[in-house]
Amino acid sequence: HKNFCKEDCLHFLQCLMECGWTPDSPADKYGNTSLSVACQGAGYEAGVCAVRYLVESGADVNAVNMQGQTPVMNLYGGRFWDGNIPRFAGFPRSYPYGGRSCTDEDAETLELLLEAGADINAKDNWGNTLLHYIAGSSTRGSKEAAALVMDFGSPDVSAVNNEGLSALDIAMEKNDETLVKFLLKYS
């Protein structure tokens, strides 16, 4: 996506729409819609442009992929995960979140999705909410993202996933002191 400029992206999407393509159709083998794929590439100008175009074209901001992940979860690092936990100590532990290091600029894309009605309490197949994804993404901008989510409603800060972990637990594991302090105010 790095070399795909904003104008090319818009032209490509417009051509697809003119040919009868619908943005809510699965765009990859994991069942991600084009909006979810664009959210995964939101760190690039073309990705942000695609997200805006797709939202303005009526893409479903709450469409889920085979993992139960919404586009906003993919913005904050959602990735394919088969649910298996490695049984050997030498293998790193993996999660469905943390697949992308997020930046401060992602707040603009997050706000766009929230304004379009993204569900802040949706859960993926493993019980993770948007706050779990934000906590697992990176320490840069995580508190600001969580604060923006709070501005759009009352997410369940104490919600635990299928492993019994809350967003606060994940933030503590990542040593994200700023997010930990912020989430403690709402716990």
Give residue spans per PLM region.
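Ankyrin repeat A-helix N-terminal signature
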Residues: 1-8, 37-47, 74-83, 95-106, ...
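Ankyrin-repeat-protein effector appendages
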Residues: 91-93, 116, 162-165, 170-187
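Ankyrin repeat domain, specifically the short helix-to-loop turn at the C-terminus of the second helix
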Residues: 14-22, 52-60, 111-119, 147-156, ...
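Ankyrin-repeat boundary/"N-cap" motif
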Residues: 1, 26-40, 64-79, 90-97, ...
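Low-complexity, intrinsically disordered tandem-repeat tracts enriched in small residues
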Residues: 10, 26, 57-59, 63, ...
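N-terminal segments that cap or nucleate solenoid repeat domains
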Residues: 12-26, 30, 34
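N-terminal start and proteolytic maturation junction detector
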Residues: 15, 85, 93-94
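Ankyrin-repeat and related helical/solenoid repeat scaffolds used for protein-protein interactions
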Residues: 121-174
